[in-house]
Amino acid sequence: IDHHSSNRINGVGDLLEFYVKDAFCGESSFLEKTNEKLSKYQQVFSYLGNSNNPPDFIIRRGAAVEVKKIEKVAGGSIALNSSFPKNYLYSSDSKIKQSCCECENEYGGWEKKDIIYAIGNVTDVKLHSLWLVYGDCYCADKESYERITETMKNGVNEIPGVQFSETKELGRINRVDPLGITYLRIRGMWGIEHPGNVFSNYLNTDSNNTKIYVLMRKSTYITLDKKPDLTQFINQNILTINEIQIPNPDNPAQNIDAILYRASF
C-alpha cells in the first residue's frame, strides 16, 4: 500500500489499521493507494481519528472502533494510555475530539455508541490473530474507572504547600522547587488484559493458522440489521459460530449470553 505522497506506510501498526478498516469497508481492500482507500472510507465512516484520541474510526450511524496492535505471536497486555477501558463511547467523554462528537450531526447527533476493540497480534507482516470484541463484553461501566480517577485527583489536590493547575490529567503541580521553575504532571496510564487471556476457556489455539474472533452480546447480535450468509465458510470448517456465556463485566457473579465467531485460515 502506498501513501498518496508515494511514501510507504510506516510499520505494521498502520497496516493493521488499514486491514481493520478494509474489513468494515469491503471494496477498499482491493485498492493500493491510500487516497483511493480514503474515498471509499468516506462513504462508510462518519469519523476518521488519529493515534492521540480515541476512537480510530466510527462506522456511519454505527459502532466506534479502536485498533490496538500487539507485537507478539499471542497474548500481551494492551496499553490504553490516558483513556480508561470503555464499555461504550459517550459524546461527553473529555478524551474525544469535538469533531468526533459532531461527526453525525446531520443525522441528529449521537450521545452513546457501541465500541469495538480491534486487537491484532502481529510480528513482522504476519497477522497471527485479530479480535473484534465489543466493549460491553470486556469492560465495566465507566463509573468503575471514573471513581478511581476522581479519588486519585482529590488525593493529589490535598497535598499541602503546593500550587495546582486545572488539567484533564490526574493533576499538575506547579512551582515544585524553591525557584518555582519546576512542575510535575501526573497522568494515568491505563491498560487491560488481552481478550485471548480473558476468554481463553472458549478458544482452540492448537494450529499456527491466522485466527479471527468476533465477540458480542447476544442482545447486540439480535439487533444487527444485516447478517451476512457465512454458510460457505462454516461448511469449509473455516468458521464456527457459537452461543456462549461470559462473565458480566459489572458483576462476575452473573453471566451474560454472547455470540462468538471463530475463524481459522
Language model feature labels by segment:
Residues 1-54, 58, 63, 69-265:
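Nucleic-acid endonuclease domains
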